[in-house]
Design a protein with these regions (language model features):
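Conserved glycine-rich cofactor-binding loop
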Residues: 12-13
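The beta1-alpha1 cofactor-binding region of Rossmann-like NAD(H)/NADP(H)-dependent oxidoreductases
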Residues: 38, 59-70, 102, 220
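Substrate-binding pocket helix/loop in short-chain dehydrogenase/reductase
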Residues: 95-97, 104-109, 207
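A short, exposed helix-loop element centered on a Lys and neighboring polar residues
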Residues: 120-121, 169
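Alpha-helical segment proximal to the catalytic Tyr-Lys
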Residues: 125, 173-177, 235
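Catalytic loop of short-chain dehydrogenase/reductase
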Residues: 133-134, 139-163, 168-177, 189
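C-terminal substrate-recognition "lid" of short-chain dehydrogenase/reductases
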Residues: 215-244
Length: 249
């Protein structure tokens, strides 16, 4: 599997970091995409190498088409793309829609939705047997917010993730006969840095009572689900959206 490539967008922290480490341990050459924190991305690469794996860090903003294209061209030089983890995503401070600026809404969609769609397009061009590929797995990152809508917290975030659900179902069916499987995870309250963006201090702990399992999830637990979707154990699974939310959705 030395020439099999896995791209993880937003791979320098949280769920992306956990997925990158596990993919590296599984034998993939991991392309760790990051936007600004080079030190964090380098730490992931170093950790993968220390465990006997291979990885490179590539800077790129998934809100910019040119950066996405450069990311995939760089990956092409390393081997055959087999896995895309569409993980890059952002949220903003708690707010109502009628108090949001257009710039905020557009930024959320540019990163969470359009970035994921363009990355998926580029992955299909490389994985699909229609284009001479040998198949592969795309794992999109949705959110429990796509289900409950995040009222009063950030409905634009929920909407951006709802679009990911539709992308997953539609694209999963579109390329099912071409060796490409497309699935999504819908994480609930996971203990990662993204919650800091909400502006709610201690948000993860505050949400525990709303979770049937009475605890937050971990990045590793989500990454384990990613690994299953990338493996042959899920070979008959495509166009599916799987909650990883402790029973909350």
């Amino acid at each position: 599997m030395t020439n099999n490539i896995a791209i993880v967008t937003g791979g320098s922290r949280g769920i992306g970091r956990a997925a990158a480490l596990k993919l590296g341990a599984a034998g993939y050459t991991v392309v760790v995409n990051y936007t600004s924190n080079a030190a964090a991305a380098d730490e992931v690469v170093t950790s993968i190498a220390a465990a006997g794996g291979k990885a490179v860090a590539i800077k790129g903003d998934v809100a910019k088409d040119a950066d996405i294209l450069a990311l995939f061209v760089a990956a092409d030089k390393l081997g055959t793309l087999k896995v895309l983890v569409n993980n890059a995503g952002v949220m903003d401070q708690q707010n109502r829609l009628d108090e949001m600026t257009t710039e905020r809404i557009r930024r959320i969609f540019d990163i969470n939705t359009f970035g994921s769609i363009i990355c998926a397009r580029e992955a299909v061009k490389r994985m699909s047997t229609k284009h001479g590929g040998t198949g592969g797995s795309i794992v999109n990152m949705s959110s429990a917010a796509a289900y409950h809508g995040a009222p009063g917290l950030g409905v634009e975030y929920g909407a951006s993730k709802g679009a990911i659900d539709v992308l997953t179902i539609g694209l999963g069916r579109e390329v099912a006969a071409e060796g490409v499987r497309v699935n999504a995870l819908r994480p609930g309250i996971i203990d990662t840095e993204i919650h800091d963006s909400s502006g709610i201090k201690g948000r993860v702990k505050l949400m525990r009572d709303a979770i049937p399992m009475k605890r937050e999830g971990t990045a590793d637990e989500v990454a384990d689900a990613i690994m299953w979707l990338c493996s042959d154990q899920s070979s008959y699974v495509t166009g599916s959206i799987i909650p990883v939310a402790g029973g909350r959705c």
